[in-house]
């Protein structure tokens, strides 16, 4: 007696994608806004504005239909957290993917002009962290409203253009700009038209590391200058103030153009209260190194400076006791 095998005992046919174990698409939707992940080399990267949380997002997660995945995307709510997904093919081959979230800056294209406190408040409400143009603070109009507080600008990380301080700004310092790491330049007055910000005593941006253009500060009220983390200036550094008491650039290594500091008073006499100037890490000034008319200067030190375009100490004050440039070996023009 011969019996044929039942169809129920036959081995089922493998699906066409039995060897596949891929994640092909991840899309997350928050508040009607969809974000599509980039999948490269088994890394799933989804980029969202820093203000957006992906927790409890609506998720569309596509992977090989015959495969299994752990953990199950449907069981996850905390999508802000990095994790690993394992996709196992129908035939048992595992493939791991790393899921990552990048919280990106919010950028504004163009110039930002903040003339009033209301302007500052309205700008902060946009959550912008990177300005791709100039940041203009205050106004030069005769009837301009005074602006005294820019602390709310602490969310800013970068200004690709210039930061320009105009005369209606009456703050004592630049508190609010301390989290900016890179700028195109800083302008407070010019060499031919000094700024008249009567209360501005301190110019400081504590997180600033790089300037692609110039620092120009021409204001006789400025007494304190402090840039704790600034390393490179791709343009000029120009300071004109008759009230200078301290000048701190502890990490500055390179000035691509001129380094020019003067403290002439309004009647043309040497000024400033500063007695010691030391730029400890500066190694190169491509242009002119000029320090002049600091009336009470006793010690002037550039301990690591190796190369300059030229040196201009034409108006060295009579009290000067120490002038130290021990490593200077290259002067491309005049000494």
Residue ranges and their predicted role:
Residues 2-4:
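C-terminal motif of bacterial Sec signal peptides marking the signal peptidase cleavage site
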Residues 6-124, 129-133, 158-161, 176-182:
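Beta-rich interaction/scaffold domains
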Residues 107-119, 131-152, 158-335:
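Concave beta-strand-loop units of leucine-rich repeat
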């Amino acid at each position: 007696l011969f019996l044929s095998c039942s169809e129920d005992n036959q081995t089922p046919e493998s699906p066409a994608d039995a060897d596949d174990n891929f994640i092909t698409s991840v899309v997350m939707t928050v508040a009607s806004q969809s974000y599509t992940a980039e999948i490269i080399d088994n890394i799933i990267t989804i980029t969202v504005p820093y203000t957006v949380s992906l927790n409890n997002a609506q998720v569309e997660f596509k992977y090989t239909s015959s495969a299994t995945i752990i953990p199950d995307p449907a069981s996850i709510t905390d999508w802000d957290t990095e994790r690993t997904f394992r996709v196992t093919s129908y035939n048992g081959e595992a493939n791991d993917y790393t899921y990552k979230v990048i919280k990106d800056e919010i950028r504004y294209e163009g110039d930002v002009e903040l003339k009033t406190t209301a302007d500052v408040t309205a700008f902060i409400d946009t959550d912008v962290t990177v300005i791709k143009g100039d940041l203009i603070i205050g106004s030069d109009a005769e009837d301009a409203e005074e602006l005294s507080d820019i602390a709310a600008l602490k969310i800013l990380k970068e200004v690709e253009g210039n930061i320009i301080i105009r005369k209606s700004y009456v703050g004592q310092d630049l508190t609010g700009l301390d989290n900016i790491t890179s700028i195109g330049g800083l302008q407070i007055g010019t060499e031919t038209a000094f700024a008249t910000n009567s209360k501005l005593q301190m110019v400081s941006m504590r997180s600033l590391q790089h300037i692609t253009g110039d620092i120009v500060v021409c204001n006789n009220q400025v007494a304190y200058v402090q840039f704790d983390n600034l390393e490179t200036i791709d343009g000029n550094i120009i300071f004109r103030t008759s009230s200078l008491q301290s000048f701190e650039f502890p990490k500055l290594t390179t000035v691509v153009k001129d380094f020019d500091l003067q403290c002439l008073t309004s009647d043309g006499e040497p000024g400033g209260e500063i007695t010691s100037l030391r730029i400890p890490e500066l190694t190169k000034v491509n242009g002119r190194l000029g320090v002049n008319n600091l009336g009470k200067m006793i010690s002037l030190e550039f301990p690591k400076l190796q190369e300059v375009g030229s040196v201009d100490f034409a108006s060295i004050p009579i009290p000067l006791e120490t002038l130290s440039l021990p490593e200077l070996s290259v002067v491309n023009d005049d000494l």
